[in-house]
Amino acid sequence: MKLLEIYDKQLVEQEEGGFRAILTRYLNKWIFTVDHKLIGTMYITFSIFAGIIGTLLSLVIPMELSTGNMLEGDSQQYNVIVTAHGLIMIFFVVMYCSMPAMLGGFANWFLPIMVGAPDVAFPRLNNISLWLIVVSFGLLLTSSCVGIGAGTGWTVYPPLSMMEYHPGHAVDVGILSLHIAGASSLVGAINFLTTVFNMKIAGLSWPKVSLFVWSVVITAVLLVLSLPVLAGGLTMLITDRNFETTFFDPIGGGDPILYQHLFHPEVYILILPGFGIISIIISRYSNKGIFGVKGMISAMSAIGFLGFLVWAYHHMYTVGLDVDTRAYFTAATMIIAIPTGIKIFSWLATLWGGVIKITTPMLFVIGFLVLFTIGGLTGVVLANGGLDISLHDTYYVVAHFHYVLSMGAIFAIFAGYYYYYAIMNSNRILGIVRYNEQLGRIHFWTMFIGVNVTFFPMHFLGLAGMPRRIGDYPDAYIGWNLIASYGSLITAFGLLFFFVNIFTPYFKKKALISKKFQRGAMILMGLDFSRDWQIGFQDPATPIMEGIIDLHNYIFFYLIVVAVFIGWVMGRILWRFAYKWSYPTIGDIEIFKNFTAYNQIIHGTVIEIVWTLIPTVILYLIAIPSFTLLYAMDEIINPTVTIKIIGHQWYWSYEYGDNSSNLVEFDSYMVYERDLNEGQLRLLEVDNSMIVPVKTHIRLIITSGDVLHSWAVPSFGIKVDAVPGRLNQIGLYVKREGTFYGQCSELCGVDHGFMPIKVEAVKVQEYLGRLYK
């Protein structure tokens, strides 16, 4: 009582000191604080603020895509919004609320407590890390408002990010923002590593350390090793822009693909901390210890190690890597699915036989398991170097990425926030603050439905060949885009319940909703889709595309079996073992366990080996046809016709062997823009129409005269990046006549959202006649 009286006396003296004393008190408490709990609270508050801005930007994107034309502005403005949304959600929400809500929010709050430390090792560095990220966020918002804005995409790939295509200082400010964000992450990672290794209490052995602490340690190690590489890549990029260096400029001997090797998307860094939170909540609400703790630690360590070996995963298969390199990345990416599968099965084994209590955090955990599993299965699809040729840079990739992050990391964030809500928000003045359970469940169900309605149709758009990062597209894609737009509104509506739920206890202690939550049915209106643009690939016109479709169906046979098995296990867990007593006693739990017909899965080495063998065998069965197709696609059999494709003007040059085996050269200017019917093809450059002979082996040589392009014709199974300074080649054999459409599907540095490509496949005689004509 004496300490409290002294504290109250100090508060009275400060209040009597006037405005200056009050200002000093608040500055010392919030701005200059070294208290790890206050810093953790400010990290989470900042992440919520950044999440609001990122979510508002994300709502603009589906609204733009709800119609086939640009609603307002041009494609540059659309790309600026896409870039800002991606950078904010990756670096300031997921990274600083999922990862440093392990290295920012949750970790600051609970990691010192879990290892028995009074605070972090370097409290002042902890404060610097927080305010660096705030400054970085301000610079990022500024970059979207300076000049034409930074419309490079969140990966900031050159040459599009070079001064020629993004003049002004918008990209420079964005690069500086990422530099400062990296410094903040690096400082935080070093701080937590030092805290765990130097301040862990003596009696706490490593096997007994919380899985959350393990996830933070592994993530921090990844950050310490990867962020300097990212900083080096950004430094080279900004010197290319301002100091005439040529690290990424082929004119001076550089290579724009080098940047893609350096700027590896840190997906594994982002998702690992969420694993720790999920493990804690599953253990708490199933009334069991986590199954196979050592196996879980080993799985996270393996994911962290393998994450450094798969940097070309799914986004570099088309840049011109040789076939052996692509085969390596295919194998390495499949292998990383094994420890991930071990974690999923171990979580299910923990739930199996447990006394489960369904609460809001547990609902988000179950949602995480379902949605992260879907994202992982589509990740196995994209890991295949042959199959990814058709799916690269389409909305299939967008769907996969968001299922892993928007529904993986973000659901883990919500689960952790609800789980620790009372601990983080209770104090002397307010007492114990609790969220409203019914509002939390409404938040979960609306968001769960919303994100699935938003992102699941994107798989179908990707299979049909719709490219990402465009604001304009053919009308054939409008149906699924419209459904995705409705889903984004449902998700935003669900987030309103979250904000009402977390802020209401500060103003009103009684529950807002007194009636029992009733589930509603959602009716989706059917839309009239053309058969060719529904839920599958476009009709194949080449053996390669037929092989891609066969491989896709083969892979999905196994993945559907896995998904059905996991779904059956989760259904049995929730149906048979759901325990609805609010406050079960130990005796009740023992009676319940003895009453059930199923025995609990005990901790043992045999079952952990089974968990490892199941994904290993399935991936081995998938790898055999995958490698067969990959090497078959690389073969170019005695090409009769060689076609060189040069972007950005899409100029075609032809070489055809005549009867004397001499090469006859032709150019592509056969169909001029003035000769096309009005409205036939939108946003033309010089010429985007070419002809090819059917049943003839063709070699395509693709390069670019300016920025990166992605030249794609879905019916051919072709998607090749046109890179300045590189000659990428691919074989082609068209089996049937017809007119096929493709697209340039990357950010090309020009004011267009969708550049269509028209390819006519005709008989050899007609082909030669049109060339000579």
Swiss-Prot record:
Pathway: Energy metabolism; oxidative phosphorylation. It comes from Dictyostelium citrinum. This is Cytochrome c oxidase subunit 1+2. Residues 1-491 are annotated as: COX1. Fe(II)-heme a binds at residues 85, 402. Residues 492-773 are annotated as: COX2. Component of the cytochrome c oxidase, the last enzyme in the mitochondrial electron transport chain which drives oxidative phosphorylation. The respiratory chain contains 3 multisubunit complexes succinate dehydrogenase (complex II, CII), ubiquinol-cytochrome c oxidoreductase (cytochrome b-c1 complex, complex III, CIII) and cytochrome c oxidase (complex IV, CIV), that cooperate to transfer electrons derived from NADH and succinate to molecular oxygen, creating an electrochemical gradient over the inner membrane that drives transmembrane transport and the ATP synthase. PROSITE patterns: COX1, COX2, COX2_CUA, COX2_TM. The gene is cox1/2.
